[in-house]
UniProtKB/Swiss-Prot annotation:
SUPFAM superfamilies the record matches: Scorpion toxin-like
Stretch forming the signal peptide: 1-19
Subcellular location: Secreted
Function statement: Beta toxins bind voltage-independently at site-4 of sodium channels (Nav) and shift the voltage of activation toward more negative potentials thereby affecting sodium channel activation and promoting spontaneous and repetitive firing.
Domain of life of the organism encoding this protein: Eukaryota
Alphabetized UniProt keyword annotations: Amidation, Disulfide bond, Ion channel impairing toxin, Neurotoxin, Secreted, Signal, Toxin, Voltage-gated sodium channel impairing toxin
Keyword Secreted tagged: yes
Name this polypeptide is given: Toxin Cll3
Disulfide bonding pattern of the chain: C31-C84, C35-C60, C44-C65, C48-C67
Modified residues (Tyrosine amide): Y85
Expression tissues: Expressed by the venom gland.
GO molecular function: sodium channel inhibitor activity; toxin activity
Domain named LCN-type CS-alpha/beta: residues: 20-85
Length: 87
């Protein structure tokens, strides 16, 4: 019984730790949202929270906004059948 309880607790922890993350993307052209200030960034945080209401954070990584703690159905880069200006 204790083993079953421990396994259930571990699975619950793993599920909360492995939340979805990804680059915020423009639905129309498939491009990532660009940013210049790397690291913690108010612009990226604001955009992530505006697009994905339950997003816990966002920062600039590789000159694009990276959103953290997203819900599983969140749409992130790359979009299927969408290329950023043919790139």
């Amino acid at each position: 019984m204790n083993s079953l309880l421990m396994i259930t607790a571990c699975l619950a922890v793993i599920g909360t730790v492995w939340a979805k993350e990804g680059y915020i993307v423009n639905y129309y052209d498939g491009c990532k949202y660009a940013c210049l200030k790397l690291g913690e960034n108010d612009y990226c945080l604001r955009e992530c929270k505006a697009r994905y209401y339950k997003s816990a954070g966002g920062y600039c990584y590789a000159f694009a906004c990276w959103c953290t703690h997203l819900y599983e159905q969140a749409v992130v880069w790359p979009l299927p059948n969408k290329t950023c200006y043919g790139k």
